[in-house]
Amino acid sequence: DLEIEFGINLFSRKGNQLMLTVEGEALYKKAVYILQYCDELQADCSSTLRVRPPVHIGIPPMLSTVFFPELLEAFQAEHPEIPVVLEEYGSVRACSLVQDDTLDFALVNMEQYNIDKFNNIILADDQIVFCVSKDHPLAQKESVTTQEMSKEKLIFFNADSVQNQLLKLRFELDGCTPSIIMKSSQIYTTLQFIKSKKYGCFFYSCMTDKFSGVVGIPLATPIRVKIGVVWKKGKFISNDMQTLLN
């Protein structure tokens, strides 16, 4: 429609591929500028409103237990005028929602193939550990192999969890099949299963001290992960968002 309206070719068509022409590139850059200007205008207007739009942050269930309770409480004590809404999603889904502007930020496991699409701040370098009841037969081991874990009844997180993908790949590379009896994003439910002494799950090592009666066993071949905050490249950062980043 734009090509007809302006009488120019915006795309170069070769087979099933579309590429921007010189005119198309110029129009694209101007469109990006206009959209950013609209975002800035909206932010300026929002700052004068009595009700400010909240900053939307995506956070996986596991990470919400470690990072955000204290951080959010401290931030809101210092900046009570800035509303913040936390929304629970796995890291994969959270990144997708940041990309389409549904979320402003997301706290995620950064071991994803497309993580370079986002701006990021790394908050922690951690590892995945195998978690069992302190009375489980494996609880005293210094490390646990994939073969040993494959003999246990396992609880994995949901499909939109990066941790899930990393673990499945590890089992596959080691020629083992995990015995997954449940997939859940609910920490409390998972802990109840673990405390029955019959099941195992996978948490980040920084989490285990927060749960009584649970032991985190390092994997024989560690799976290390970086945890950080991501936001969309090229996105206009409002004053409230910048304050939160700072």
Question: What is each model feature region?
Answer:
Residues E3-L20:
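A short LG(V/I)-centered, amphipathic sequence patch enriched
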Residues E23, L27-K30, F67, L71, ...:
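Short amphipathic alpha-helical coupling segments at ligand-binding clamshell hinges
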Residues G90-S91, C95-T102, N109, V162-V215:
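Hydrophobic hinge/microswitch elements
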Residues I115-I121, D126, Y188-K235:
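Beta-alpha-beta core module
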Residues K117-I128, V132-L154, S238-Q242:
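Flexible hinge/capping segments at coil-to-helix
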